[in-house]
UniProtKB/Swiss-Prot annotation:
This is DNA-directed RNA polymerase 132 kDa polypeptide. Coiled coil: none annotated. SUPFAM superfamilies: beta and beta-prime subunits of DNA dependent RNA-polymerase. Part of the DNA-dependent RNA polymerase which catalyzes the transcription of viral DNA into RNA using the four ribonucleoside triphosphates as substrates. Responsible for the transcription of early, intermediate and late genes. DNA-dependent RNA polymerase associates with the early transcription factor (ETF), itself composed of D6 and A7, thereby allowing the early genes transcription. Late transcription, and probably also intermediate transcription, require newly synthesized RNA polymerase. GO terms for cellular component: DNA-directed RNA polymerase complex; virion component. It catalyses: RNA(n) + a ribonucleoside 5'-triphosphate = RNA(n+1) + diphosphate. Keywords: DNA-directed RNA polymerase, Metal-binding, Nucleotidyltransferase, Transcription, Transferase, Virion. Belongs to the RNA polymerase beta chain family. The DNA-dependent RNA polymerase used for intermediate and late genes expression consists of eight subunits (147) kDa, (133) kDa, (35) kDa, (30) kDa, (22) kDa, (19) kDa, (18) kDa and (7) kDa totalling more than 500 kDa in mass. The same holoenzyme, with the addition of the transcription-specificity factor RAP94, is used for early gene expression. The keyword Transcription applies.
C-alpha cells in the first residue's frame, strides 16, 4: 500500500509549516512571530528611537539654537538566567544606557560655534530597565547562549517578584482603509489616517475627514483639526495634481455605475460654481487665501511662508517624500472610493473588518511606549531649560531631569495591564495551565474603550474577514470579552520587518514597477493606482493589471524582492486599485497556489518523494510556486477554493477562476482547539465550551515551581495523550501533558450520577489519580517597629513562627496561623498604671480552609519588612471538584465509591469514573466515543509495523468519516488477536463489555460502553470556592462581612436573604441574624412628629428639625440594625428624606369586651 496518497499531500505540506524550521531560525512556530517582534525592538528599533539629534529651542530667526543629542545607546543583558531571577524574586530585565549632550549652536560669520551646556553619561544600573521576553528554551534575544530547556516554551516576561506576565495582541485603532460613515440621510463622511513611514522619527500622525452632503455639494470639503485648511476636495486635488476639472471628472467617472457618474458630474459642477463665483479665479491664490485665514485663526507664531510650508509639506505624512502631483492623484483615488461607497456600502471593507487593521505585537507595544516616553523626556528637558532661563537667566538642566527618562514606569505599567495610560492589554498568566502561554500571546483583541465609545462598532459578531485566519471555536462564550478576543489559527502569524529591510524592500518594488514602460505606469486618468503602504507610486494601464499581478506574485515567491510575506491585492469592483503591503502587523498564512487553473502542488512530481527530508523553508526555496504566504487583505480580494478535494471536482474552466486553495479543515483551528478531538463530529457549542475548559485544565509541573513564589496549580502525575493532532504535538502541548488516562463506563449508578454528576473510584484517588499540588503565594508588609516588637502574651496564632518572627519551613499552616510577627504597641497616658505599655496582634492570618506546608520564605528589609511565603498542598479529588473530557463533557464529583461498590468486567477491572450515559445524547458528543474507541485500539496495538510507538492522529477538525476510524480499530484488534469471532470483534471495536453487579455478582442485561479516555481536571476546586462563615472580619462602614474569598470574606446577609427566610416563616432567625447579635444591635431614637432620627448632643437626645421650630416632640426608642441607620443617614446627606412613621391604632384593652351569653344552647 502506498504510504501517502495525493489527497494527503496538502495535509503533509500544512504539517511542514507547524514543525520547527532551524534553517529559517524557527525553533518554536506558535510564538515565533512574537520572538521576532520583540528581538527587532530590542536589537534594532530601540537604538533608532533613542538616537536623537534635534533642536530644543531656537532664537533670533533660528541663528541660535539649543540642541540635544542622545548617542551611545547600549543594551546589556542580565548576568543570570530566568530561573535565577525566580530564585532571587527579581524581575528579568535588560539594562539600556545612553549619553545625553545638550549644547548651544550659534551661527556666526566664521561658521557655527558650539557651546556645551550640559551632558550626562548614563551608567546608572537603573536608567532604563527593559523587561526581557523569555523565548523558547529560556533564551532571550540578547544572549542566545543560555542553556536550552526544550519543554519550556517561553513567551513570558518575568516581572518584579518573579511573576510571569503575558499579554494579548491589540488591534490597532488606525485603519489602513478610510472609514465610511453615514452621518444622516444624504450626509456622509470618509475619514482616514496618515502615518509617516518607520524611517521617519518622531512618527507624525495626521487624521483627515472628507465630508459630503448631497444638499450642499459645494461644501464637499476635506479638513483636519489645526493641521490643515478646510477646502473643497475637488479643488484641492486640482491644486496638487495640476490637472483640469475635466480630467478629474473623467478619472472619477471611469468604470463607474451610472448612479455614481451622475453624482460625479454634480460634484464637479459644484466645484465649477465655486470657481465661477470668484472673479479672475486662480487656484493658487484661492489656496493661499485659505492658508492665510487659517494662519490668522490659529494665531501662529510662524511667518506665513513657514506656516504654509509646514501645512502643505506635512500633508499626508505617509507620502512624505512624494511630489505634490502624486498626492493630488491619491486624493482623486480616495474620492473615487468615497463616491462608490455611498451607493455600494456592502462591497467596501467596513471598519470592523480585519482587512482595515494592523495588529500590535509585543515589540510594537514597547516601541510605542519608547516613542511616547522619549518625547516626554525631551519635553521635560526643554521645559527645564526654559524655566532656568526665565528664573536665573542661564541655559541649564537639572541632573534629576536628565536621569529620569520615565521608561521604567511605562514598561512597569505595561506589564501591570496598562498600555498608553488607559488601555488594558496585559494580564497575569494563571498558572493552572501553561497552555495559556500559547493561547494568550496568539490572541487578538480590540481596545475595550474602542467598543464602548463607538456606537457603530459591531465586532462582537464573527466577522467574515476573520475566516481562515482566526479560530472560530476558541472565542469567549460569555462576559465582556465576547466577540472582542479571537485566537489565531495554527497557520496564521503576524508580520515583522526591520526599518532597513522596509526601505530596501520598498526600493526594490519601486524599481520593479519603474522597469515597465513609462506610459504604461502613468495612466493617472483611467488607470489602476499602485500603492505601497497606501503611498501612490504609479498608475497602471488597465490592460496590463492581470499580467502585472501574476508576474509580481511569481517574483515574490521566487525571492526576487527578498521578502516572501509581501501582500499584493488587486481591488476590482469599480474601485480599481493595486495595493502592495509590506509593513508589520499584517496577518499572513500560507495557501496552496493555483496558476492558470492548475494546482501547482500537482505539477511538481518530485515534491512527494522529497517532502519528508525538507523543511518549510526548503519547500519555499526549491518549489517556490507550490505555497504562497498571503496576507488577509490579499485573501479577501482573491478567489480561494475551500479544499483540494473540491478543487479537483471542478471543471477546467471553473478552476481557472481561482487564485489559491486552502489546506484541510484542521489547520483552521487554533492551538487550544487543536487539543480537542473531532469537534466537527459534535454539536457546535461543544467546540466553544471545550476550548474554554481546555484552558482551565490543570497541566504538569513547571520547571521551577519551588523557586518561583507565585500562585499555581500543577498536575502531579501527568500522562501524554494517546489521541492527538499534529498541532498538539508540534506545539509541545502533548509532550508537557494536561491530563491522565482513566477507564470510564457510560451507565447510571444508583441514581447518583444524574446530570453532571460523576462517580469516581476511591482506590483511583488513593493511587494518585488526577492528583494535584497547589502552590500559593502569601505576601505581607509589616512596619519595622511592629516586626521587632515582642509578644507580651503567648498567642496560638504565633505557634508556627521561629524566634526570628518568620514562619518555619515545612510547617503546616492552618486557618488562623500568622505568617510573620506583627505586634502593634501603644503607650497609655496613665501615671498610676504600673505597666502603661499595651500591645496587640495585628498580623495577617492564613485563611484557607485546608492545611498547607511552607515551602519557601523570602524577606526584604527596607522601611518595611516585606515577607513572601510559598505554601504547597497536595489535593486529591473530593466531592464537588470538576473534571472534563476533551469533548466538553464536564462532570462534578457526586460520590466517591469504594472498589467493592463498583461493577466489574470478566477480568475484575472496575471503572475509574462512571459518567451518565444520557450526556452523550443530550450534548451530541460523538467524538468522545470515537476517542475511547481509538484509545482502546491503541492499547491493542501500540506500535506500528516498524516497532515504533505511534500515537493516534485524530485532528480537532477533520474530514475523515467515522467508518474510517472503525476500520482502523478493527485492523488493530485483528492484528493482535486474529482468532476473534465477529461478535467479539464488534464488542472490542465499539468498547462494549458485560459488567457484573457488585452486590449480586450477576451480569447486567445490557452491555456497557467501557474503555479508556484522556481525562482533565479543572481548576474549579471546591475548597477554593467555599466562602461561608459565621464570624470573622467585617467592614467598618456597614459592619457586614467582607466581600471576596481572598480577604476572608463571608456571606453578606441582606434583603434577598431576608426574603428567603420570610418565605420559610423563620421570623426568629431573621431577628437573630439581622438584629440581635452584639455588633449589629443599634438603639435609635425616632421623632414621632417628623420621623427624623434624633441626634445626641451632650448626652441629650433631641430632634434637630423640631427643636429649630421650638417644638417638643415625643422621642421613641426603637432597636434596629446598624446598616439601616447608615442607610438613612446617607440618604439624608443626599437630600432624600426618609420618614419613619409609627402605626396608629388604639391598644386592644381600650376596646369594650363582647358580651358572652352563658345560657345553655337548648334554652335559647
Amino acid at each position: 500500500m502506498k504510504k501517502n496518497t495525493d489527497s494527503e499531500m496538502d495535509q503533509r505540506l500544512g504539517y511542514k509549516f507547524l514543525v520547527p524550521d532551524p534553517k529559517a531560525g524557527v525553533f518554536y512556530r506558535p510564538l515565533h512571530f512574537q520572538y521576532v517582534s520583540y528581538s527587532n525592538f530590542i536589537l534594532h528599533r530601540l537604538h533608532e528611537i533613542l538616537t536623537v539629534k534635534r533642536p530644543l529651542l531656537s532664537f533670533k530667526n533660528n541663528t541660535e539654537r539649543i540642541m540635544i543629542e542622545i548617542s551611545n545607546v547600549k543594551v546589556t543583558p542580565p548576568d543570570y538566567s530566568p530561573i535565577i531571577a525566580s530564585i532571587k524574586g527579581k524581575s528579568y530585565d535588560a539594562l539600556a544606557t545612553f549619553t545625553v549632550n545638550i549644547f548651544k549652536e550659534v551661527m556666526t560669520k566664521e561658521g557655527i560655534s558650539i557651546t556645551k551646556i550640559s551632558s550626562y553619561e548614563g551608567k546608572d544600573s537603573h536608567l532604563i530597565k527593559i523587561p526581557l521576553l523569555i523565548g523558547y528554551g529560556n533564551k532571550n534575544p540578547l544572549d542566545t547562549a543560555k542553556y536550552l530547556v526544550p519543554n519550556v516554551i517561553g513567551g513570558v516576561f518575568i516581572n518584579k517578584q518573579s511573576v510571569e506576565k503575558v499579554g494579548i495582541n491589540l488591534v490597532e485603532k488606525i485603519t489602513t482603509w478610510p472609514k465610511f460613515r453615514v452621518v444622516k440621510p444624504n450626509s456622509f463622511t470618509f475619514s482616514f489616517s496618515s502615518v509617516s513611514p518607520p524611517n521617519v522619527l518622531p512618527t507624525r500622525y495626521r487624521h483627515y475627514k472628507i465630508s459630503l452632503d448631497i444638499s450642499q455639494l459645494e461644501a464637499s470639503n476635506i479638513s483636519s483639526t489645526k493641521t490643515f485648511i478646510t477646502v473643497n476636495i475637488v479643488l484641492l486635488s486640482q491644486y496638487l495634481s495640476r490637472v483640469s476639472l475635466e480630467f478629474i471628472r473623467r478619472s472619477l467617472s471611469y468604470d463607474m455605475p451610472p448612479e455614481v457618474v451622475y453624482l460625479v458630474n454634480a460634484i464637479i459642477d459644484s466645484a465649477k460654481r465655486i470657481t465661477e463665483s470668484i472673479t479672475d479665479f486662480n487656484i493658487d491664490t484661492y489656496i493661499n487665501d485659505l492658508v492665510e485665514a487659517e494662519h490668522i485663526k490659529q494665531k501662529s507664531q510662524l511667518t506665513i511662508n513657514e506656516f504654509k510650508y509646514e501645512m502643505l509639506h506635512n500633508f499626508l505624512p505617509h507620502m512624505n517624500y512624494t511630489p505634490d502631483q502624486l498626492k493630488g492623484f491619491y486624493m482623486i483615488s480616495l474620492l473615487r472610493k468615497f463616491l462608490y461607497c455611498i451607493y455600494h456600502t456592502s462591497r467596501y471593507p467596513d471598519r470592523d473588518s480585519m482587512v482595515c487593521h494592523r495588529i500590535l505585537t509585543y515589540g510594537k507595544y514597547f516601541e510605542t511606549l519608547a516613542h511616547d516616553e522619549l518625547e516626554n523626556y525631551i519635553g521635560n528637558i526643554r521645559n527645564d531649560i526654559m524655566n532656568n532661563h526665565k528664573n536665573r537667566g542661564t541655559y541649564a538642566v537639572n541632573i534629576h531631569v536628565l536621569t529620569t527618562p520615565g521608561l521604567n514606569h511605562a514598561f512597569s505599567s505595561l506589564l501591570s495591564g496598562k498600555f498608553k495610560k488607559s488601555d488594558g492589554s496585559y494580564r497575569t498568566h494563571p498558572h493552572y495551565s501553561w497552555m495559556q502561554n500559547i493561547s494568550i500571546p496568539r490572541s487578538v483583541g480590540f481596545y475595550p474603550d474602542q467598543v464602548k465609545i463607538s456606537k457603530m462598532f459591531s465586532v462582537r459578531k464573527y466577522h467574515p474577514s476573520q475566516y481562515l485566519y482566526f479560530c472560530s471555536s476558541d472565542v469567549p462564550e460569555r462576559g465582556p470579552q465576547v466577540g472582542l478576543v479571537s485566537q489565531l489559527s495554527v497557520l496564521s502569524s503576524i508580520t515583522n520587518i526591520l526599518t532597513s529591510e522596509y526601505l530596501d524592500l520598498e526600493k526594490k518594488i519601486c524599481e520593479y514597477i519603474r522597469s515597465y514602460y513609462k506610459d504604461d505606469i502613468s495612466y493617472f486618468e483611467t488607470g489602476f493606482p499602485i500603492t505601497i503602504e497606501n503611498a501612490l507610486v504609479a498608475s497602471l494601464n488597465p490592460n496590463m493589471i492581470c499580467d502585472f499581478v501574476t508576474d509580481f506574485r511569481r517574483r515574490k515567491r521566487m525571492g526576487f524582492f527578498g521578502n516572501l510575506e509581501v501582500g499584493i491585492t488587486l481591488v476590482r469592483d469599480h474601485m480599481n486599485e493595486i495595493r502592495i503591503n509590506i509593513g508589520a502587523g499584517r496577518l499572513v498564512r500560507p495557501f496552496l497556489v493555483v496558476d492558470n487553473g492548475e494546482l501547482m502542488m500537482d505539477v511538481c512530481p518530485e515534491l512527494e518523494s522529497r517532502l519528508d527530508d525538507m523543511t518549510f523553508s526548503d519547500i519555499q526555496k526549491e518549489f517556490p510556486h507550490v505555497i504562497e504566504m498571503v496576507d488577509i487583505e490579499q485573501f479577501t480580494f482573491s478567489n480561494v477554493c475551500e479544499s483540494v478535494q473540491k478543487f479537483r471536482m471542478m471543471s477546467k474552466d471553473e478552476r481557472k477562476q481561482y487564485d489559491l486553495c486552502d489546506f484541510p479543515a484542521e489547520f483552521r483551528d487554533g492551538y487550544v482547539a487543536s487539543s480537542l478531538v473531532g469537534i466537527n463530529h459534535n454539536s457546535g457549542p461543544r467546540a466553544i465550551l471545550g476550548c474554554a475548559q481546555a484552558k482551565q485544565a490543570i497541566s504538569c509541573l513547571s520547571s521551577d515551581i519551588r523557586n518561583k513564589i507565585d500562585n499555581g496549580i500543577h498536575l502531579m502525575y501527568p500522562e501524554r495523550p494517546i489521541v492527538i493532532s499534529k498541532a498538539l504535538e508540534t506545539s509541545k502541548i502533548a509532550a508537557n501533558c494536561f491530563g491522565q488516562h482513566v477507564t470510564i463506563a457510560l451507565m447510571s449508578y444508583k441514581g447518583i450520577n444524574q446530570e453532571d454528576g460523576i462517580i469516581i473510584k476511591k482506590q483511583f484517588i488513593q493511587r494518585g489519580g488526577l492528583d494535584i499540588v497547589t502552590a500559593k503565594k502569601h505576601q505581607v508588609e509589616i512596619p519595622l517597629e511592629n516586626f521587632n516588637n515582642k509578644e507580651r502574651d503567648r498567642s496560638n496564632a504565633y505557634s508556627k513562627l521561629e524566634s526570628n518572627g518568620l514562619v518555619r519551613l515545612n510547617a503546616f499552616l492552618e486557618s488562623g496561623d500568622a505568617m510573620a510577627r506583627n505586634i502593634s504597641s501603644r503607650t497609655l497616658e496613665d501615671d498610676f498604671a504600673r505597666d502603661n505599655q499595651i500591645s496587640f496582634d495585628v498580623s495577617e492570618k492564613y485563611t484557607d480552609m485546608y492545611k498547607s506546608r511552607v515551602e519557601r520564605v523570602q524577606v526584604e528589609l527596607t522601611d518595611k519588612v516585606k515577607v513572601r511565603v510559598l505554601t504547597m498542598k497536595e489535593r486529591r479529588p473530593i466531592l464537588g471538584d470538576k473534571f472534563t473530557t476533551r469533548t466538553s463533557q464536564k462532570g462534578t464529583v457526586a460520590y466517591i465509591a469504594d472498589e467493592t461498590e463498583l461493577p466489574y468486567d470478566e477480568n475484575g477491572i472496575t471503572p475509574d469514573v462512571i459518567i451518565n450515559s444520557t450526556s452523550i445524547f443530550s450534548r451530541k458528543t460523538i467524538s468522545m466515543l470515537i476517542e475511547v474507541i481509538l484509545t482502546a485500539a491503541y492499547s491493542a496495538k501500540p506500535y506500528n509495523n516498524k516497532g515504533e510507538n505511534r500515537p493516534v492522529c485524530f485532528p480537532s477538525s477533520n474530514e475523515t468519516s467515522i467508518d474510517t476510524y472503525m476500520q482502523f480499530a478493527k485492523q488493530c484488534y485483528e492484528h493482535s488477536n486474529p482468532k476473534l469471532s465477529d461478535e467479539e470483534l464488534s464488542d472490542k471495536i465499539f468498547c462494549e463489555k458485560i459488567l457484573y453487579d457488585p452486590e449480586t455478582d450477576k451480569p447486567y442485561t445490557s452491555k456497557v460502553f467501557f474503555g479508556p479516555i484522556y481525562y482533565l481536571r479543572l481548576r474549579h476546586l471546591t475548597q477554593d470556592k467555599a466562602t461561608v462563615r459565621c464570624r470573622g472580619k467585617k467592614t467598618k462602614l456597614i459592619r457586614q462581612a467582607n466581600e471576596g474569598r481572598k480577604r476572608g470574606g463571608g456571606i453578606k446577609f441582606g434583603e434577598m436573604e431576608r426574603d428567603c427566610l420570610i418565605a420559610h416563616g423563620a421570623a426568629n432567625t431573621i431577628t437573630e441574624v439581622l438584629k440581635d447579635s452584639e455588633e449589629d444591635y443599634q438603639d435609635v431614637y425616632i421623632c414621632e412628629n417628623c420621623g427624623d432620627i434624633a441626634a445626641q448632643i451632650k448626652s441629650i437626645n433631641t430632634c434637630l428639625r423640631c427643636s429649630k421650630l421650638n417644638l417638643s416632640p415625643l422621642l421613641t426608642k426603637i432597636d434596629t440594625t446598624h446598616v439601616s441607620k447608615v442607610f438613612l443617614t446617607q440618604m439624608n446627606a443626599r437630600g432624600v428624606k426618609v420618614k419613619l412613621d409609627f402605626e396608629r391604632r388604639p391598644p386592644s384593652f381600650y376596646k369594650p369586651l363582647d358580651k358572652v351569653d352563658l345560657k345553655p344552647s337548648f334554652l335559647v
